[in-house]
Amino acid sequence: MKKSDFEYELPERLIAQSPPQHRKDARLMVVDRAAQTIEHKAFSDFLTYLSPSDLLVFNNTKVIPARFFGQKASGGQVEILLERMTSDVTALAQIRASKAPKPGAIITLADSNTPVRVLGRAGRFFTLEFPAPGISAIAATQGQIPLPPYIKRAPEGLDANRYQTVFAQSEGAVAAPTAGLHFDEPMLAAIDELGIDRAMLTLHVGAGTFQPVQVDDILQHEMHQEWFSVPSDTASRVQAQITKGRRVL
């Protein structure tokens, strides 16, 4: 398979730059593989495609403000995009700068005196060390929500809420699990009223999700890694669904 096999025209005017007023107002494309048909619906119609025997599995990862701006000792500007936290004070990150910083270099975050130390580099990722009180606390005051590259606007206050699912709980993602963004509390309540079972897992979406495929032969593409956790209860319920021949969505 070649990368060119998947290329198609997508006019920029069709890429929404801001979310709809209500989550459920997003558009929904319904593909019927058996009938070979495509329908365009609203996400509020999603419930009509569910059955009481279904199991819905949601990703409860929570997006952190993972984009930072700073400068090197030389004065050069630096942009940091966290890939994933490896401890409370260390993280893998992508760095954009005119010249890549070397191990031992200090990056001072913009509008503060917060020093971030470069511990090392492996491929396109740098290992960074943040000072106390740790990455989460520093991100809350210094970081920005890392909007996808196809969003051609500056971050807004609304993004902290709308670029987050309503069931987000476990901090660690640098990008939202986008399919989950369209669910709101009333829809989740309606799912429960229909007797449809729900389960949770955690998969921290990494910055690699923004990286384009660099090779022409798709089979040679190296996928990035992401941290995940599947609770034993969720695994058991998924297995029970499969055993009974029921759907897991």
Predicted regions located by residue number:
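Surface-exposed, charge/polar-rich loops and edge strands
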Residues: M1-L249
